[in-house]
Amino acid sequence: MRKAIAVASSLFLALSVQAQNVDMKVVNETIPTYQVGAPEIDPIFFTGRVYQGAEGYIYPYSLYDVMTDVVEDKDYQIVKLGNKYIEIGILPQIGGRIFQAEDLTNNYHFFYTQTGIKPALIGMLGAWLSGGVEWDIPDHHRASSYMLVDWTTEEHPDGSRTVWVGESELRHRLKWSVGITVYPNSSRVEASVKVINPTPMVQSMLYWANVSVHCDEQYQVVFPPDVKFGTDHSKVYFTDWPNGPVVRNNDKTVDLSWWKNFDQNSRSIFAWGSRMGFVGGYDYGKDAGTVHVANRFQVPGKKFFLWGNNPAGMLWNKILSDKDGHYLELMVGGYSDNQPDYSWLAPGEIREFKQTWFPVKGIQGIKNATEFAAVNLKNLEDGKWLLGYNASIEMRNARVILAAGDKILLDKRIDINPDKYFLETVIVPSDVKREDLYTALTDAEGNLMVDYRPVNYADKGLGKSGEELPKVIDGTKPVSEYKTVEELYLAGLRVDQFNNARLDYMDFYNEALKRDPDDARVNIEVGKHYIRQAEWSKAEEHLLRAKSRLEHDYTRAFNTEADYYLGYVYAMTGRKAEAEENLWAATYTPAFKHPAYYQLSVAAACEAKYSEALHLVDESLLTGAHDLQALTVKMYILRKLGRKDDAQKVFNEIKSIDPLDYWSEFEKSMLDKGSMSFLASTRPRRSEGMIAIQELLEVVCNYMAVGADEDALAVIDEAVKIGNPFSDSQLVRLYRAYLLKDEDAAKSEIGIASGLSSVGNHPLRIEEVGMFGRLAEICPENAVIRYLYGNLLYYIGQKDHGLEQWRKAADLDPSSALACRNVGFGEGQKGDYSKALEYYDEAIKNNPGDPLLFAESDKICEKAGVPAIQRQKRLEAGLKTVMKYDDAVIRLLKVYNETGNWNKAIKIMDSRHFHLWEGGGEIHDIYVMSHILKGKSLLDKKAYKRAMEEFRLATLYPENLEVPAPAKSVTIEDVISEMRQELNDNYAKFGDEDSASKAKSLDELEKLVKEIKMK
């Protein structure tokens, strides 16, 4: 049971002004919550994991994959926005999602609202919560969707209120903010989305709002009526819409818009080719629904996902919620119409767009919608048409018309608002064609609110739309099949852009360079690849090749990308004159004028040439007016020039663009107080733990980039003064050591860092390569520095150098389980299994309570061909630890089956609740194998009834394993048939002498099954 307690805060009392119709308050709600285990202590590096069709990176985050059955009441801060029509609740603690949304006029939850918190293994890092609205940037089910994000609130002169949520994500170092606004006298929920690339590198990003709604047999997805086709993930399959196969490549067609018809499996369908700007869903049982509206050019993605009306769907309902029922996701994509579908974000670029949702009711469906209203026009029978309008705003003396060509069939003046809808049945003459009908709602002044003209497709759907299905993607071919360098370049670019986990874009680029070593396009991409790895000399080599080709015969290049990135390489390696030459050359073309001038401004600021720096940053802002990094640099420069009033104006501009911008807050504190003392006051509304540390270090790096080391140190000192998480962070302490000018003081700080825990300290920036190199020079025998340096190098792609640093760390401190494990992991990836096991054994000796060590090392044992009985002894030696972690238990169960200890395996599987990743099913395969192996052993003993029971158990899908049953059930006969096939195969291959005897046993078993069924 929830209890809501308003937070006693004068701030929120001031915001809670009923007269302005929008109430904003923060409440504490106590919600039953399934606890998530502690995050994984070992860093998890990328080894090719595919997640949501793209690279499934964990590092630089930690893994949160231990779900529990422990339910505790937990307090959450929920920020509520409401007026007389709607109330929504935003939950900063779990990703900043919209957690609650209710239409107060009919108590309809227009977003799926959880009454409990029950995470499952669906998120990029593991723990994930269904329901509400999740902001997925720059990847689907983004890494931090179950973490606290930054948040703040705003009130506006028109009485509207906004809650801003956002973060600086760690994988690509992109920043995003979403402002969620409710307006007076309106049912609209508006999201102002900002996706920001503050880095000097081009990045790829994906945006989807993952919107969930309650559904049942009477729920229908509403794609725009001009949608003729749907497509699956990656556009590998198309179907007619709405009538198509419920299972891909199946002849049986159903109406795919109805949840009830998905009786086989889960499904995702993306709308294809719509020129309308809305998508929605309608519950005919409640006569209510949800609609989303946005600029279709900026927000083209329209998709639904459902677990479906089938046994697997029912199981997922239980996994994700104890009592809140079925849900369906009505997703919408910004700059993306599929998943994965990434687009490029230039250095310093900010993308800004708006989305609007509102509840609808009483109009029995939706045919079109704008942010102001939704319309339904539906053919009933005998010439009757149902016409309905639902408004998201209040309108008096509005006008509704229905026309057939020039003939007006209905013309009414009405009052309409979110609580008062319009619904009427109109007689339409029999000679009127549906496509000749037209209806519109205008306000009292004649401004169009929404209109609709029926779309007519002859024989639409049922595979008879009159048009062929759109072409599926060709897919990326093997490198050798591409005939031209251009094709190789474009294939590699797509692999890079889409963060493809299965392919390496460098394979395509390397082949292209074999054919044409000086191809400019390919050399630029390879240069950028090496920049990301901080391989500066290699980056320079390829960028110079590109520059040489582009500027042949003293040509002023049409594309100055090579100049820009060369300038950045030289700036990062201290070659100032060469950096300046190339950055100025990059300003010659519009595409790189903005980031090049920014880098030139930063370089001038480093030399305290503030007047010059100001001019240069202004030049950058001419083509990148909303670049928050450039604006904050300008604010910093103005402060250094003593122009405080002008700096304040820039701060106001920054906050008007992104109220959650962090660096400018530090500058504002320096402007007002001459110190970073504001930091403590912002903590309640900012991220926590390692995310808070990394966001702080982004600011520190920004100050270091402009040569403001004293300010960078002041930020760290203020953070350390606050205490945890900053004071106990090795990373924070090592940054401080690096910034201290006195080497003895630096050594002292390194000593403090070395006494702290390394868990969760995950360096991630290419700027840190130089820092750790310098720290290693100051204290070459420090194991912590070597360990963290290794993490950084391995993560950015310098794997051999990273492994070398880990080896040094393990040699310097053999008691470090983290370092020993990392060496074991690295050696295992290289294929040196004996050396890997040597280090894993050392790690287990140092930390016998870490179950990941057992899971990972058993995989190495398996690859190395270690006998199963030895693997069993190894795992059983740490049985108490192994049993803490599903992955380790699964390794043990597999070994038990190999060693004939299936009874032990069955006992564990009968009593343990496994929490599996979405799409995972290995535990059920093990379960089936255990019972079949046991059944076979009983069959050999001619214990037919007991064998039959084991085979029957093998056909089941116990709920505690969390593996959904297939739509078509498996029978004992199926099991026997498979065993007979296996027997025949073995006889054909090996001439098995026992075949006749075993076949006879199977005959006896089949006979017994038939006898029992007849009874």
Question: Where are each of the predicted segments found?
Answer:
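A contiguous, surface-exposed recognition patch within enzymatic or periplasmic domains that forms
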Residues: 27-39, 43, 79-80, 86, ...
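Extended, loop-rich substrate-binding clefts of extracytoplasmic carbohydrate-active enzymes
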Residues: 44-73, 78-80, 129-187, 312-343, ...
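Long, contiguous interaction/recruitment modules in multidomain scaffold/adaptor proteins
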Residues: 366-483, 662-664, 670-681, 738-767
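Start-of-helix register in tetratricopeptide repeats
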Residues: 486-487, 521, 561, 595, ...
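Residue-level recognition of tetratricopeptide repeat
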Residues: 493-494, 528, 568, 602, ...
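Hydrophobic/aromatic packing residues within the alpha-helices of TPR/SEL1-like helical repeat arrays
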Residues: 509, 543, 583, 617, ...
